[in-house]
Amino acid sequence: MAAKNRTIKVAINGFGRIGRLVFRSLLSKANVEVVAINDLTQPEVLAHLLKYDSAHGELKRKITVKQNILQIDRKKVYVFSEKDPQNLPWDEHDIDVVIESTGRFVSEEGASLHLKAGAKRVIISAPAKEKTIRTVVYNVNHKTISSDDKIISAASCTTNCLAPLVHVLEKNFGIVYGTMLTVHAYTADQRLQDAPHNDLRRARAAAVNIVPTTTGAAKAIGLVVPEANGKLNGMSLRVPVLTGSIVELSVVLEKSPSVEQVNQAMKRFASASFKYCEDPIVSSDVVSSEYGSIFDSKLTNIVEVDGMKLYKVYAWYDNESSYVHQLVRVVSYCAKL
């Protein structure tokens, strides 16, 4: 890994929604430099999609393309178009971290191709295929990363929103069991119009339907908060918004805190990555947020019947920007190892 007194060199494999937003975020980081991008799309198209973003607005930088060089103001970035990560020149460019954001190389075997190409570490911007790969959520368990971890998963956007809620409730009150629901903006995995898809619900037009589908966040939470392993299940409702989502967590607790006590526990956990919100916000208010999770204190509630209590807590997130800033925090943390 990079020495602590020098800038770490990053390559991005896959320049889609996450890859481009990671690039935007890293432009402002003094200790991190994006050296290269690998994507099968033509560089001119990548440049256009980097500059103009329907959800997050225009990138106010001068962007040009010459041969296989993407130039942003005075900064030059190499653009490669290689299907096999093992053939990428990561050793030649002294790459410290590869951000693997294609969604294709999420197994240990796939991600390790970047290591074989000379990269020193790989951070997967998705849940990993194997549980043996360390899964981290910044500000919940990121300090478990060691210098020996060469492949890391930054989990999913929903897990990054859910994990602080589970961590706080488990630590302060103990979770017996529960379920979670994410009301989630539609994504590129869905169909714009009715068209074939392995998931028949995702086959339906994303912009005009509420689409029930799966989420791995509830089961993956045990990789981040081990004490909650096996205690949660959940699902997703994809809805017709471009970005901006909310998690509902319903749990039975070992203790019997009041709404105020639950909220105060969340407030104590607030940080640069976890916001405690007292305003009556809606999804558009969290678009482009840098917080991984935004706790909505106004929505905390309890249902009590015959002495049994069901607790509901809610947190917002921009399923693109919130996740990207969490991932970038993990990258910056790895630079210190």
UniProtKB/Swiss-Prot annotation:
It catalyses: D-glyceraldehyde 3-phosphate + phosphate + NAD(+) = (2R)-3-phospho-glyceroyl phosphate + NADH + H(+). D-glyceraldehyde 3-phosphate binds at S156, C157, T158, T187, R202, T215, G216, R238. The keyword Translocase does not apply. GO terms for molecular function: glyceraldehyde-3-phosphate dehydrogenase (NAD+) (phosphorylating) activity; glycosylation-dependent protein binding; NAD binding; NADP binding. The record marks H184 as: Activates thiol group during catalysis. The active site is at C157 (nucleophile). It comes from the Bacteria. PROSITE patterns: GAPDH. Catalyzes the oxidative phosphorylation of glyceraldehyde 3-phosphate (G3P) to 1,3-bisphosphoglycerate (BPG) using the cofactor NAD. The first reaction step involves the formation of a hemiacetal intermediate between G3P and a cysteine residue, and this hemiacetal intermediate is then oxidized to a thioester, with concomitant reduction of NAD to NADH. The reduced NADH is then exchanged with the second NAD, and the thioester is attacked by a nucleophilic inorganic phosphate to produce BPG. Belongs to the glyceraldehyde-3-phosphate dehydrogenase family. Homotetramer. This is Glyceraldehyde-3-phosphate dehydrogenase. It comes from Mycoplasma genitalium (strain ATCC 33530 / DSM 19775 / NCTC 10195 / G37). The lineage of its organism: Bacteria, Bacillati, Mycoplasmatota, Mycoplasmoidales, Mycoplasmoidaceae.
